C-alpha cells in the first residue's frame, strides 16, 4: 500500500500493540516490509526474552511490521501459537539459537526450524487457544480490578492523614 500503519519494535509491549504510525511508502523506514494479514503472529526476533509478540486480529490489512519481527501464519488457532511462543520453554529454546549477547537475535529461518509440540487436530488447537484466551482475559480483568482497589486505598489513605 502507498500509505500504511507502521509497527516498529517499540510499538508492541507484551502481547499488546500500544502504538503505530502512518507512513507513506516513498519515505517509510527500510525495515517496513512485513504486510500483516488477519491471523498473522509477529514474533520479535531481537531480545526475544522480552516476549513482545503480537497476534494481528484486525480486519484492516493496512498494517506493515518491521523486519525485526518474524511473520508467522498459524495453521490453526493463532492464540494457541501466541501462548506457545510466550512460554518460558519456547523462549529458552529461542535464546539457545540466538546470536549476540547484548542484543540476542534469531533470524526467521532459524526460528522456523524450532520444533514445537502442537495438536494435529485443528479443532483441539482451537479449543486450547480459546481456553488460554479466556484465562488471559480473566487475568487482565483481575489486574484492572486490583489497580482500581489500589487507587481507592491510596485515595483513602491520603484523606485520612491530611
Residue ranges and their predicted role:
Residues 1-162:
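Feature detects amphipathic, helix-rich regulatory segments
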Amino acid at each position: 500500500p502507498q500509505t500504511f500503519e507502521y509497527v516498529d519494535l517499540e510499538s508492541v509491549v507484551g502481547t499488546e500493540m500500544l502504538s503505530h504510525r502512518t507512513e507513506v511508502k516513498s519515505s517509510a523506514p527500510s525495515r517496513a516490509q512485513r504486510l500483516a494479514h488477519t491471523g498473522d503472529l509477529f514474533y520479535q526476533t531481537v531480545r526475544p526474552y522480552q516476549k513482545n509478540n503480537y497476534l494481528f486480529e484486525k480486519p484492516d490489512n493496512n498494517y506493515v511490521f518491521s523486519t525485526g519481527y518474524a511473520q508467522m501464519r498459524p495453521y490453526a488457532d493463532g492464540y494457541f501459537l501466541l501462548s506457545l511462543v510466550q512460554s518460558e520453554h519456547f523462549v529458552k529454546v529461542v535464546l539457545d539459537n540466538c546470536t549476540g549477547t547484548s542484543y540476542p537475535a534469531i533470524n526467521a529461518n532459524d526460528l522456523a526450524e524450532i520444533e514445537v509440540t502442537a495438536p494435529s487436530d485443528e479443532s483441539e488447537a482451537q479449543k486450547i487457544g480459546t481456553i488460554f484466551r479466556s484465562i488471559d482475559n480473566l487475568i487482565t480483568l483481575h489486574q484492572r480490578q486490583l489497580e482500581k482497589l489500589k487507587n481507592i486505598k491510596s485515595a483513602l489513605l491520603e484523606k485520612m492523614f491530611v
